[in-house]
Amino acid sequence: MSYEPRGDHDKGYGGGGGHDGLPPRNRGRRPVTDYGASVVHYMRHRQPRYRGSYAGEVERPSPSYIVDMLPPYARVTNPADSVPSRHLHSSLNKIKHPINVVRWTPEGRRLLTASSSGEFTLWNGTGFNFETIMQAHDSAIRALVYSHSDDWLVSADHDGIIKYWQPNFNNVESIRGHTDPIRDLAFSPNDTKFVTASDDQTLKVFDFAGGSTDMTLTGHGWDAKSCDWHPSRGLIVSGSKDHLVKLWDPRTGRCLTTLHGHKNTITKTLFERVQGNCLATSARDQTARVFDLRMMRDIALLRGHEKDISTLTWHPVHSNLLSTGGSDGSLFHYLLDEPNTAPDGSVMPIPAVYDTADPSSAPAQPIYPAHKIPYAHDFAIWSLDWHPLGHILASGSNDRITRFWSRARPGEAPESFNDRYHIGEAAAEAQGTWDRRGGRHMRQVEEEQELEDEMDGLVDQKMPIKGQPGVGGGGMMPGLSFPSIPGLPLQQVPSSGPGGSGFIPPPPIIPGVGGATGVPPPLPFPIPGMPGLPAGVVPPPLPGLDLKNPPDFSALAEMMKKAGYQPPPPPGSAGAPMPPPGILPPGLIPPPGAAGFPMPPPGFAPPPLIPGAGGPPGGATHPDGGNDQYDSSGRRRAPLPSQEESLRMEQSKGNYTRVR
């Protein structure tokens, strides 16, 4: 664990000077997990397995032993060293929604979360800061899984829609899977098929390439809440609201066996990934069970929860470490090879099933948690997922917060065990490990940090409108954005876009307004409808109109409003009828070349276009019909940009220049 300074020296606020005359703001330090040193230390001192695994220096409760920390792969036989007992960071969106699914990307660099609003959110896996957000579904996302080849991502929502995604979040395909909400899905070992569980009481096996249904598994009497495909065998497991756990043969669609171990709705079924010999299930009866697939019976009964268990997950390295999340926000960790008797000692330890004379008839061994985090979240934990390296656990909850957990560093155990997540806010405040005012302040600081991360988030990959031939200003017609007065030339300046130079019209000069004191220059052409005036002569002002004291239009509008008069709707709007073809609305000047109106000389801006009428002849339009809406609200909804370009930008600022 290292720390990243929160000062932003480049922008002038945070660590350096002030910004716009304001004093610098100190953001403190953001915790960052740097596991590179631990992995390098393990790689340098590791030994082949046949000679015995490297145990390394024993970690002692002192900060000086932090350098001896090793990744979980270095100590496969010591799962207690990988128990995530320390809170790292809490990540929350600006617009908060319940987090239904959390999934680490296959390489472990980012965490992907899916919310009830149908949005994907990417969090950095090292600094836990916000990276990007996108609208993935129209309804709540209920399931999310990566393929075993790491080439595809499949998501399912509350409307029964299944979507295919590439790793860069390019939506390739969208199919209708079920008519009811889809609760879970899983890939086959070779990624050619995947299975879904739905509230319509069925499971469906889909062909991934064709997107068609190969098989429908029926047999549950109520909603199917969970499913999983064995990582190396042709075996599917499902859990339902009818309290049953069923095992299926995906080749024939036949139900192999039914496990009657729970007394309430099954919430999660998951195969163990390391050896593949066990199956874990959780239910709303406050228990979780571990089944041995070789004996087709339960071998362990996980107790300790005071409320329903909503989810569980296996450790990716240690096959005997299981974590569960409760509906009350508690997070428990179980070591399956240690019984960990009841805290009050009321239950005597029972030997394991494998140690009895008759394993087929022996009762399941009760196991109590090796570590408890009773106040991990304020509400139910919906999803848990381990980092591929096995050192960080991510949790998503109904309290709209995504939290990261890791093992305590040497010397941090007493402090981490007495925080508000372990003993509660009141007890932590009494012990001095948490301050209520400071907690609110930290929550505000975290929200401000997320806002800053959003400002530095990934930009939209949609290209801006390029300049059209003969049209400057990035593709915008002159005279549309900035009104111009005939007779006033436009200033030609180089354009910042790739389209080259263009005209940027200055604001109009009105006599008597601002710093304009002169009269407009003479017009180079006669005004239609005034044959008595020679060319170049400006007509006199209307009687009672003082050019030095122009009328206040806001005051006139207020007077009309008080008198009960409504201003006429603008021509071409929804409330005003369009005139017949060939007749202009009242108050509009005919376009150049119509009704005897002369064309403007070269270099002059054309007049504004008529509402509801087409553009000028030969005018170019945008390829997508002008429906280009750039989202500048602070949220960047786009796929990830190139990492090489980001690296070059950082190197140009002087960062990441040293070779590690």
Curated annotation (Swiss-Prot):
Record InterPro entries: Pfs2-like, WD40/YVTN_repeat-like_dom_sf, WD40_repeat_dom_sf, WD40_rpt
Residue ranges of the region described as Disordered: 1-32, 562-660
Stretches with biased composition (Basic and acidic residues): 1-12
Subcellular location(s) of the protein: Nucleus
UniProt record, GO biological process: chromosome segregation; mRNA 3'-end processing
PROSITE patterns xref list: WD_REPEATS_2 (PS50082), WD_REPEATS_REGION (PS50294)
Gene Ontology CC terms, in alphabetical order: mRNA cleavage and polyadenylation specificity factor complex
Superkingdom of origin organism: Eukaryota
CDD domains: WD40
Ranges of the WD repeats in the UniProt entry: 94-133, 136-176, 177-216, 219-258, 261-301, 304-344, 376-415
Principal location class: nucleus
A Pfam family it matches: WD40
Presence of keyword Repeat: yes
Transmembrane spans: none
Biased composition (Pro residues): 566-610
Keyword field: Chromosome partition, mRNA processing, Nucleus, Repeat, WD repeat
Primary role: Required for 3'-end cleavage and polyadenylation of pre-mRNAs. Also involved in chromosome segregation where it has a role in chromosome attachment to the mitotic spindle.
PANTHER family, per database record: PRE-MRNA 3' END PROCESSING PROTEIN WDR33, WD40 REPEAT PROTEIN
UniProt-recorded name of the protein: Polyadenylation factor subunit 2
